[in-house]
Amino acid sequence: TGALLLDGNTLNYFGKIFLPDGLLDRYQAFELIHARKPEDFEKYQAFELIHAR
């Protein structure tokens, strides 16, 4: 879960500059920042290749 990512380094990197109060609740934001590929990554990758040409 996002709560597991709230260590000191993560809070220093994704601090108030990047996640200001009121924009997202910190726990909601860390659910989005999980460093996993999306389920449909291949589709997005194909679109990026087409866009890059």
From Swiss-Prot:
Residues engaged in binding chlorophyll a 1: E48
Gene Ontology molecular function, alphabetical: chlorophyll binding; metal ion binding
Bound cofactor: record note: Binds at least 14 chlorophylls (8 Chl-a and 6 Chl-b) and carotenoids such as lutein and neoxanthin.
Bilayer disposition of the protein: Multi-pass membrane protein
Compartments it resides in: Plastid, Chloroplast thylakoid membrane
PTM annotation, UniProt: Photoregulated by reversible phosphorylation of its threonine residues.
Annotated residues for binding of chlorophyll b 2: R53
Family: Belongs to the light-harvesting chlorophyll a/b-binding (LHC) protein family.
Biological function: The light-harvesting complex (LHC) functions as a light receptor, it captures and delivers excitation energy to photosystems with which it is closely associated.
Known partners and oligomeric status: The LHC complex consists of chlorophyll a-b binding proteins.
Protein name: Chlorophyll a-b binding protein 1, chloroplastic
The organism's taxonomic lineage, starting at the top: Eukaryota, Viridiplantae, Streptophyta, Embryophyta, Tracheophyta
